[in-house]
Each structure stands twice: as structure tokens, then as C-alpha cells.
């Protein structure tokens, strides 16, 4: 399919063909079919809340999770044992709860941070002290989205720096710390990849907190579930982040073609051939 697409001159047609033949949507209630039956039975005996509570009492490593019920999860090359790829800047409000929510699913990770002034750094260092399989990585440059002074001040350089601490050919999953994760469903999703080139792209639901109440966000079409985006589980083979210049409205993610001097410098994931 990749070879065929190379000879199709129109980008939109190539994209449509790839989407039709290469992408597979997996419903949440279908994921259990990817797990060995014995493992599934063991995992379903436990819940996220009990494991999170158990892990809060653990100091110095060895936190517990669903990965304890499959020996393959001990393999550092297995998709069942991905590195959490985390970047933080001033997210103290949600940071601790988000990190604790992934522990029953994820055994290790790197936590990059920069320019933190709200106590996020202290939360990260305390978390990594309690769970030393997570590595704190302080980026030594300020990130400047608009008019960056140097390459080191650009977001893509920050991503590449943090990712450099993840061993090559091992799996990673991009974790955002303004998200709260269902660890059981997250861990089960790691059974989806069957080949090293398989990639999982996760959808999500957005919540709005207003006047002491939570609301589920719906788009103009009334849809709750957001389309899968850049929250990926992928093998760290020939990956790198590249600069992409975006117009002011970052929600539309329009690539800047004119007025480059006022564009914002973001990042896009690429794979070296």
C-alpha cells in the first residue's frame, strides 16, 4: 500500500487511501478480545481506585499495576511496557492526580519540565523520588513559542531532548498531565500492537469545570468523543520531532505560509526513512 501511494500525485487522495486501508478503529468494548483469557480474568479482578490507593503507600519504587499479571510486561522491548513520555509546564492543578492515574498501567517514564513557577517542579521531583522508575528531566532553556531566540528555545528541540532519554527501539506513550487516565483501559490497549510498526492513536473526552460543576464538552455536531490525535503509543525507532510553523489560531492547526514572522513555533512527530 505504501508503494502504491507513492505514485499517486494528489495528497488528499493518498491520505484517503491510507485512511481507508491502513487505519483501524477499535471500539473500547472490543479491546478485551486482544488479551489472553487468563490475563483478562486476573486484570478484571482489580480496579483503578484500589491500585492507586495501594501505590500511594509505596515509597522507593516497585509500584503495582495490571502489568503484574502478565510476564511479558517485564520485557523492556514489549509494547506492554512503554515509557511514559511526559512534558510539563505549570500544570500543578492536575499534575499529581494525572501521574497517579497512570501508575497501574505504566511502569516507567521520563518527565520533562521547563519554566515551572507554580510548584510543578516540586511535585515532579517528589513523584520521581517515590517512584524512581520515572526520571525527572529539567530542560535548561526557556521555551519560546513565538519569535524563539535560538533552536534550543523551540518546542521541537525540547521534545527531542526529553525523548533522547528513552532507549531506542523501546515503546513510548505520550502522556499529557491535564488528562486523567482510566488505567485499566489504558493497559489493555497495549495489547493492540502486533507489529513493531503498529501505532495506537487515542481519542478522549473533554470536561469543563465551572462553578463547582463538571460538564462534558460537545462540539458543534453534538459529538463527545474527540478524534484521535497526537496522543500516541509508538515504538521509539527513528522518531524525531520537527518544527512546524502555525498561524495564531492553534486549534485549527493551520500551517503558516505567509506572515512567517508572526507564526508560532510548534512540533510535529516524524519518522526517519
Please provide the spans of the model-predicted regions.
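Catalytic-site signature of metal-activated, phosphate-bearing donor transferases
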Residues: 3-72, 149-160, 179-273
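Active-site-proximal specificity loops/subdomain of glycosyltransferases
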Residues: 60-79, 119-171
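Short, well-formed alpha-helical segments that are part of the catalytic scaffolds
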Residues: 63-71, 91-109
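Active-site beta-to-alpha loop of glycosyltransferases that engages the nucleotide-sugar donor
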Residues: 79-100, 115
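Short beta-strand/loop segment that forms part of the nucleotide-sugar
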Residues: 107-118, 139
